[in-house]
């Protein structure tokens, strides 16, 4: 059938939505993320391209969250 289905589970991605958060809220969120930074849209886009190009990878949910879900 050659149907591939994968999903991306993003964590906090720097965006207009995170830009309006107070420093206190941002600091509290970043304290929980092992990489200590918000992700970037380009990083999610790179993962999307990778998943779309893999012929033998299917049925996966890939977290891109700076290690938060570990």
Feature roles, as predicted:
Residues 4-6, 37:
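Short, cationic motifs built from Arg/Lys/His that form the positively charged side of catalytic pockets
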Residues 9-19:
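Short, flexible catalytic-loop segment of classical short-chain dehydrogenase/reductase
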Residues 24-43:
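Catalytic Tyr-x(3-8)-Lys segment
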């Amino acid at each position: 059938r050659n149907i591939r289905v994968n999903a991306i589970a993003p964590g906090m991605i720097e965006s207009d939505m995170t830009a309006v958060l107070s420093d206190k809220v941002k600091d509290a969120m970043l304290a929980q993320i092992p990489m200590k930074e918000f992700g970037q849209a380009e990083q999610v886009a790179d993962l999307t391209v990778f998943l779309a190009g893999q012929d033998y990878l299917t049925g996966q949910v890939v977290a891109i969250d700076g290690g938060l879900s570990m």
